[in-house]
A protein has these predicted regions:
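Short, compositionally biased low-complexity segments
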Residues: 1, 78, 93-95, 119, ...
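Flexible, low-complexity segments enriched for small/polar residues
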Residues: 1-10, 21-24, 37-41, 50, ...
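N-terminal accessory alpha/beta regions
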Residues: 5-149
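Active-site substrate-binding loop specific to GH73 endo-beta-N-acetylglucosaminidase modules
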Residues: 72-89, 98-105, 129, 137-350, ...
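Structural motif
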Residues: 96, 111-116, 182, 202, ...
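Short, solvent-exposed secondary-structure capping/transition elements
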Residues: 115-119, 132-137, 172, 312, ...
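Hydrophobic/aromatic pocket-lining and membrane-interface residues
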Residues: 124, 159, 538
């Protein structure tokens, strides 16, 4: 995730082999200064198990007289309203808590002494995809992240079994629907297609037989459970082998396939080096993974010590993902905490990568997909928001944002309207039929439940810190070990600090001319009492260059 000049200087005299070894095998490096995730305390036992939908919730409440730990009213209007309020509370609270989780993770990336652990956790997060959109439980997303952090550099077999038994993955790929006699193929398909082998290396019968092996695997809260009555213990024919396989045995058969190591090695190479993986190199790297019994660290050590890694074809060809861009920018600027302004979650979302909300089961496309004309502009906007914070900033974790219906309900209630009037849409012709039916149901009001859910969540979820980046570019430039005397020196200083692939001499000259014009002089010593704003302007331009997107 980048380094400061001091970080680079500290490693200048160290044997490169030792640097790589400590990077891939950091177990003896003390990382105890990193704080654990500070949970808000939004969960209680009554919320588990959480219903699949609001209609499922209200049906359960009507049938049993309670749901989500809340009893329905014996009589009166909107008897189910407290239950519906609680449903929306958890949706909002888990979403906000997951955003807090992303901010916490970004700070770990920024401050860890074991950077490859977090970089690998980011890789696995895009490889073994789960999404809060469907999981709807920050606790499960946290537990999955901790699995990636703990095992991401170790034994791939252990990691793969851990993922197959992970509550977030089980929820995301519908484990509850995978039953003896009626197997659900989602996980069996994805474990081969996306997680281990790649398209074309298995058959549809392999998927069906593999799904049978995983029947009965489920979760209770945040724990993995096996329901023996729902597990199909019969014989299966899977990838050319025959037997009464369970999920772990199916995983072992997958790992025996030669293509599995090649597929995984190729994907890791693309993540760390470049998009094009020569077939011969992919096979050679697969051989390394097989020879080391699927230990990830030796493979990465081989990649990082190879001539290919430092070749012209590889160096400076990696397009930074949004998370890499944002965290490395803060790292190179010497920040110790991720700023709360701009908002981390909104920033990476605008750039195309929302942690814990991947777009599909295939994760993010990586590479050139990160750069479109619109996204390149957004990257420049991010740089500007760091050096010139938005004075109109509204904390998104304290505000429902684009959900205008919730805002309108709150405004109408504040004016003294009753619940029915406050929740009635302004344009009845545009109201969906389903919502019309919900409004006529005297047992509950869906719009009011959504409004109350936000209120209740805001009361419980801890707010994110909202400080801006404590930048002093004047001090930074003047403290340079190489004297900075002219605008051209300033540009060279920022390029040396922030870039792997420097801009052209002509581009540097244009930036220096811009800075000279803003300062009204070529003499940095003369301008040092008033140059902070001009330095921020030129840094914004520098960080918006195409070359800065490369790592």
């Amino acid at each position: 995730m980048g380094a400061t000049p001091d970080d680079a200087a500290a490693l200048a005299g160290v044997d490169p082999a030792r640097i790589v070894h400590d990077l891939v095998a950091p177990q003896n490096i003390d990382n105890g200064a990193l704080a654990a995730f500070d949970e808000s305390g939004v969960f209680d036992a009554g919320l588990d198990p959480f219903p699949t939908s609001r209609p499922a919730l209200t049906d359960q409440a009507k049938e049993k007289g309670e749901a989500l730990g809340v009893k329905i009213k014996p009589s009166g209007n909107r008897r189910l309203q407290p239950v519906v309020d609680r449903f929306f509370y958890w949706l909002r609270a888990s979403k906000l808590e997951t955003q807090r989780l992303g901010y916490w993770w970004a700070n770990r990336m920024l401050n860890t002494k074991r950077p490859l652990e977090e970089k690998m956790a980011l890789f696995w997060h895009g490889h073994f995809v789960s999404s809060e959109e469907k999981v709807r439980d920050y606790r499960k997303m946290l537990k999955q992240l901790q699995l990636f952090q703990a095992k991401g550099l170790g034994d791939f077999r252990e990691l793969l079994i851990g993922v197959a038994q992970d509550p977030a993955m089980l929820a995301y790929l519908d484990a509850a629907a995978n039953l003896k006699g009626a197997p659900n193929e989602n996980f069996a398909r994805e474990i081969m297609e996306l997680f281990t082998m790649g398209v074309g290396n298995y058959t549809e019968p392999d998927i069906r037989e593999g799904a049978r092996a995983f029947t009965g695997w489920n979760f209770a809260g945040t724990k993995f459970v096996v329901n023996d009555e729902r597990h199909d213990g019969g014989d299966k024919n899977f990838l050319g082998e025959h037997g009464p396989f369970d999920g772990v045995q199916v995983i072992d058969i997958i790992l025996k396939q030669p293509v599995t190591a090649d597929y995984l090695a190729g994907k890791l190479y693309r993540f760390f080096v470049r998009d094009e993986v020569p077939a011969k190199l992919r096979t050679e790297l697969g051989d390394v993974l097989r020879a080391n019994k699927y230990q990830i660290a030796p493979l990465l050590e081989t990649i990082f010590r190879s001539r290919d890694f430092y070749s012209n074809a590889s160096c400076g060809t990696h397009i930074k993902s949004p998370v890499e861009l944002v965290v490395s920018t803060y790292k190179k600027l010497g920040l110790g905490v991720v700023p709360g302004v701009p908002d981390f979650h909104e920033t990476i979302s605008a750039l195309g990568q929302t942690l814990f909300w991947p777009p599909t089961v295939a994760g993010w496309a990586q590479g050139r997909s990160w750069i479109t004309p619109g996204l390149l502009i957004e990257r420049g906007n991010f740089a500007r928001d760091v050096v010139f914070p938005d004075i109109g900033f509204i904390a998104p974790d304290r505000h429902p944002g684009g959900d205008f219906q919730i805002l309108q309900v709150g405004e109408k209630l504040a004016r003294g309207l009753d619940i029915s009037s406050a929740t009635m849409p302004d344009n009845k012709d545009q109201m969906a039929t389903a919502n019309m039916m919900a409004d006529r149901d005297e047992d509950f009001n869906t719009r009011y439940g959504s409004y109350r859910g936000w209120q209740m969540a805001l009361e419980k979820v801890k707010p994110l810190p909202r400080h801006t980046a404590p930048l002093n570019l004047t001090q930074m430039v003047l403290a340079s070990k190489t004297p900075v005397k002219t605008p051209a020196d300033v540009v060279d200083y920022f390029v040396g600090r922030m870039f792997l692939v420097p801009p052209s001499p002509a581009e540097r000259a244009r930036l220096a001319a811009f800075l000279e014009k803003e300062l009204g002089t070529k003499d940095i010593a003369h301008a040092q009492t008033y140059m902070e704003e001009s330095l921020r302007m030129v840094l914004h331009l520098i960080l918006s260059l195409p070359e800065y997107q490369l790592g």
